[in-house]
Amino acid sequence: MEIFESFGIEGEVTKQWEPATDEILWCRNESGTLSRMERFRNEPPVGVKWTHGTLQQGRVEEIMKKRITEISGVEVEYSTELSDLTINTRESSNSKASACSVTIRSVADDQEAHRSSETIRARYIIGADGGRSSIRDLMGVAMEGTKGTAIWGVMDILGGSDFPDFGATSVVRSDSDGAVDFVRREEGLTRIYVELNKCAAGWEALERDTITPELILEKCRYIIRPYKLEVDYVEWWSSFTVWQRLSKSMIVHDRVFLVGDAVHTHSPLCGMGMNTGIQDSFNLGWKLAGVVQGQLNYDILQTYETERRPVAEALLDTDRTVLDLFHAPLGPEAEALLAKVPALQVYLGGRGICYHESVLTCRLAQTLGDLTAGECLPDVTVFDYATGRPSSTHSWIKGNGGWAIIVWAGDVSRPSQMNLVQSLSRDMIELRDSLGKSGSMIDFFLIHCSAWPSVELADFPPLFFPTTKTIGRPNGRIFVDEKAVYDGLHISRAEGGVAIVRPDKHIAWAGGLQEVDSLQRYLRQVFRPQPE
């Protein structure tokens, strides 16, 4: 959702989605009784606006495509397939060379002989073509992992049930019968996942090619007995066997980048695939755009794999834990797994990601309260010092590759503190100007915690005004903390500090107002100076 907010589509997503507020576990005990065991509140952690929600992937794609066209005029072209991909390795060390050659052909015409083909030269290729990725195969990148034995059926239905928690996200599991997962969907739909080939007589030898919608519903009704399930309409159904696999690499010859299911495959039970794929793509996208436009140094592209591979590994670990929740026998093992659910909720929300030390993440710098390099910036509300309007920190960072430097100025009613802010601002103006056009990608914001009457807007440095006018100059970059944000984030009101925030809202560097040398070193190793 934080990524969607960057592109201004979060409102359209939340307008269509079904909020997922509670998660409920039912179990059948040894005596055969089915009963509710646990109920988990799915509340957003501190610094997060949204709880979880469910929305069909096709709808998300339509929202994204519409926004892409609005922003750039670019439209997604379908009915094509990749037939060849080569990399000129002699040119791959030249970052400006179009070292990739791709041949695509139209598949709109069923007649093979009539299919037209086209060869495209490109500097970079992104393989976002799914679990059966042609790009991955053509590059000879292997997938490593295991295939499970459980066969699952999945359906989107309109219907009703006397099962008490049919209206919530619910898991029904039995050591002997298998499991069912009910997930509420948009417009009254319910997604049903049903474990088909576990234990119950006659189901163990089930083959995927024999599965039908009627068979999935039969097994679902068997697992939730004595409760009934009535189905009015089946919108979609399928079946799957879980593969948990990870590609051996995510970057080939520094030119081909794999994202999403082309890198990691797992069960669809928690809806993590699309979310993680979008995060992969956004992580890569702003880096690639910055390099192509000459704003960022070329070596930052390597951080795509160093940052996202650990996330992919954690994704597979999480998937194993979720599957274990369905299969662990009642007792201590199941209780230990249930204790992991709160942490799983944080991870599934995408907020548990912390990137390690790299050219893009300076974790060795002095920390700033709870703001730690590598973690996502908390989304907190502060107030425009000129208008008093509330503003969220995440709303400042748009999906245009822009960076933010947030100066936590502390109590600037103290002259010594304001002097520190003035000195830092002069250094930042000098650095920004030395970067030329690349410096325009950095926006500066200030949050102080002084009382309203104690400081005038004109007392603040010109760095935080988006115009050079000195009379009637508009604001929009200077904010005041009225809701104990400093205290909540454990930032010193007396000392303040600085946080550099990347385009993906992860903190790149955090330290004190006087850590100017470290801050400048970081920016110079990331940004590439460009003449105006």
UniProtKB/Swiss-Prot annotation:
Pathway listed: Secondary metabolite biosynthesis
Keywords: FAD, Flavoprotein, Monooxygenase, Oxidoreductase
A GO term, aspect molecular function: oxidoreductase activity, acting on paired donors, with incorporation or reduction of molecular oxygen, NAD(P)H as one donor, and incorporation of one atom of oxygen
Enzyme Commission numbers on file: 1.-.-.-
Pfam family, one: FAD_binding_3
Biotechnology: applications noted: Hancockiamide D displays potent cytotoxic activity against murine myeloma NS-1 cells, suggesting a potential antitumour application. More interestingly, hancockiamide C, the likely end metabolite of the hkm pathway, shows potent Arabidopsis thaliana seed anti-germination activity, but is inactive against the monocot Eragrostis tef seed, suggesting that it could be a herbicidal lead targeting monocots. The herbicidal activity of hancockiamide C could be due to its phenylpropanoid-like structural features, which may act on the plant lignan pathways, and hence warrants further investigations.
CDD domains associated with the record: PHOX_C
Binding site for FAD: R191, I192, Y193, D261
Class in the EC hierarchy, top level: oxidoreductase
PANTHER family reported in the protein's UniProt record: 2-MONOOXYGENASE, PUTATIVE (AFU_ORTHOLOGUE AFUA_1G13660)-RELATED, TRK SYSTEM POTASSIUM UPTAKE PROTEIN
Entry function: FAD-dependent monooxygenase; part of the gene cluster that mediates the biosynthesis of hancockiamides, an unusual new family of N-cinnamoylated piperazines. The NRPS hkm10 and the NmrA-like reductase hkm9 are proposed to convert two molecules of L-Phe to the intermediary piperazine called xenocockiamide A. Xenocockiamide A is then converted to hancockiamide D via a series of hydroxylations and O-methylations.
Family: Belongs to the PheA/TfdB FAD monooxygenase family.
Protein name in the entry: FAD-dependent monooxygenase hkm7
Organism: Aspergillus hancockii
